[in-house]
Amino acid sequence: MSGQETAVIEAVAQWQITHPQPYFKRVQVFVARETGGRRLSLVESDTAPPWTFSVRSGKSSPENERQLAENLNEAREQFRVSNEKPVELAQPPFGVFLEKGLQPIWSEPGIGWAPILEKHPGADYVVSFCRPGFNSAGTFAVMELTEASRDTEPCDWVFQLRRIDEGTWEVRTAKMITERSSTGRPSR
């Protein structure tokens, strides 16, 4: 993705959760090279509840922006009604996997994205997830995704998740919330 496009990660498939307390302790993400809208397939983790997730890139549109804002507002209202505070979304990522050899990198507070990309020159695109926060009814959740590539500065996205049935979540995208410098600190 180029900085000119300011892409929104649009599609998201199904997220399988089988643990009775669906909170991630750490998340493993497998990342493929992203080239001109190529689909990125993220496969099952062996250290968290089984899940599947797929991502594709797309340009933002007024209708898309409106729908994303509605989704996020709906999730926030669910949290307000349930009087339960979601998990802090500004925490550092739990885990990162890069394309080249799928080596794991467990991040620490304050870690920058530029050193990660420099250490793994074969990685065109980096994706990391933070632990989601759930409302008390267990019908909605919010989580954060952080992405970085060689062409753009790292940025954060907020996702809304809606429960479809027992153990299955539909994940929807929401608006980009921050842009960060190469140090990993929010620039907003």
How would you describe each model-predicted region?
Residues 1-154, 177-188:
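Flexible low-complexity loop/turn motifs enriched in small/helix-breaking residues
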Residues 157-181:
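Short beta-strand edge/turn micro-motifs at domain boundaries
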